[in-house]
Amino acid sequence: VIGGDLLNQIISASFAVKDYEGSYVGVYGACSTMAESMLVGGCMIDGGFADKTVCVTSSHFCSAERQYRFPLEMGTQRTPTAQWTVTGAGGALLSSEGRGPVLESGTFGTVIDMGVSDANNMGAAMAPAASSTICAHFEATKTTPQDYDLILTGDLGMLGKKITLELVRRSGYELEG
């Protein structure tokens, strides 16, 4: 099992597997946790270290608000750039055999810090790394946006999405349309 969540010490994921007798790798990538767990799982399978991996993530709106922004009980007004964390969970079983969808390739990103320090505008903070990773993936795989049915990121918010689209456009790729 490879998994994580948005809370300190990935406590939810760790407690979820506490009685599981197999191996567990905890990952913490905030908005990228699901993609990160699937990339790690795919690498483990491709490298011959596992035949199957279960990749999971979860998040909880109120817990994320308390940890990253303001507890809801404070009644603080949200800024227009604040993200909306989902309350939910998801998982995927990756296997070295079968006929399901295929994890064909993936690209690990890099940290790009442009100095954004507003905790209510994490989309602007994440946009440079998101756009860099998207473009690096196109270059590494010799693909273009038209080769994909869907390109997803974590919640960049409206402003972060706008910044990401512009940065990707400056690199020569058009994601809209």
Go through the PLM ranges and name each one:
Residues S12-S14, L39, A64-R69, K162-T164:
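Short acidic, glycine/serine/threonine-rich loops at helix termini
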Residues A13-S23, I45-G47, Y68-Q77, V168-Y173:
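A glycine- and small-aliphatic-rich helix-loop capping segment at beta-alpha/alpha-beta transitions
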Residues V27-C55, L94, P128:
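Active-site-proximal alpha-helical scaffold in enzymes
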Residues G47-T57, G100-P101, A140, S171-G177:
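Structural signature of cysteine-dependent C-C bond-forming condensing enzymes
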Residues P71-C135, A140-T143, G177:
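Condensing-enzyme catalytic core mediating Claisen C-C bond formation in acyl metabolism
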Residues C135-L167:
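Long, repeat-rich segments with strong aromatic
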